[in-house]
Amino acid sequence: LIAAGRNRTPGEPLNVAPVLASNFYLPDDRLYSRSDGTPTSDALEELLGGMENGKALSFASGMAAAAVILLRLPVGSTIAVPVDPYHGVAGIINEGEAQGRWSVLRLDQADTPAWLDALQTCDLVWLETPENPLMTVADLPTICAAPRRDGTIVAVDSTFATSLNQQPLDLGADVVMHSATKFIGGHSDLLAGVLITRNDELLEEFRHRRLLYGATIGGMEAFLTIRGARTMALRMERAQQNAMELAIRLEAHPEISRVLYPGLPSHPTHAVAATFMTGFGAMMSFETTGAGERATDVCNRMELVNHATSLGGVETTMERRAVIPGQERIPPTLIRLSVGCEQVDDLWADFLQALAAP
């Protein structure tokens, strides 16, 4: 993360990749930034691809990266997807289904036998693990290594885990997607996405579709993503320590009815996660006692923790997910928590005062 993506040619700026304002180049190997990217995005792709021993392609957002995978499917395709995926991905899938473009098989991510069956019948198997916001972990070693129908693509959204905690390509996945907006960037100041694969044919298809969809990352965004990625290991180490401690304390609090964090032995997929994840991430969800209004009240009373959407920054954020359109199936008292790098006792003091209020 620290050494990759640096130009070591004598006389070149080693410390940071240059940000070039020009959107075109005099004819050579690179002509136009929408089709060919920039030297800054090249450096970013070297860095991110190296994290998973693959080849990376950067995008203007995580949703742009996801759309390139989904919209490559021809009419009549079948997609296997978790019951409660990220709502943006669900929006694309639901729209395509309503238009008759594809059929959708919605599966409990913990139901490994169902996913193994899907490998024999579906054109795309889309896994999101840990899943947003219930934190269900898929059995990636079993699913990704299982026999599949010729042409079936296994894609893994690894945003919550990051490459530091799981390596889907090593397990047999075809492509990994990250919303680099989140933990890779890490400072809540950019939009970016990435696809990583070891399949050169897929990589070139993704590159062509990135060109067609105008989804190439900007130079400044690529620069910011590189800057953020340099410290990801340090940030994740601190955030995961905080997350584990908060999960333990919240689980013991009388005003909390349930905590969903893969690192807790009480989590339904903890045993699966422990077999292949090297860390459990900085994302969790918990449910308050009472009704949905109680969860909203807790969010509004927090002083240090930000009540806002998005996640993965150095600051801790929380959000009541059931109020998001399309997320009505989520328990009304569930709050998703993205744990940051603050002092854990400061965070806990904030929770105590918010939960103590009537």
Regions found by a protein language model. Give the residues of each.
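Short amphipathic alpha-helices in soluble, non-transmembrane regions
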Residues: F206, T296-E303, D350-L355
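Conserved PLP-enzyme active-site core in the AAT-like
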Residues: A3, N7, A56-H253, L260
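Conserved C-terminal alpha-helix-loop-beta "cap" of PLP-dependent enzymes
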Residues: R258-I335, V339
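PLP-dependent enzyme catalytic core of the Aspartate aminotransferase-like
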Residues: G100-S103, L116-D117, L140, R235, ...
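Short conserved active-site loop signatures built around small residues
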Residues: L1-V19
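Short loop segments at secondary-structure junctions
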Residues: N23-F24, T197-L202, A229, T288-E293
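Short gly/pro-enriched beta-turn/loop segments at secondary-structure junctions
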Residues: P13, G219-M220, A252-P254, T278-G281
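Conserved N-terminal alpha-helix of the aminotransferase class I/II PLP-enzyme fold
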Residues: V16-R72, D84, G88-E97
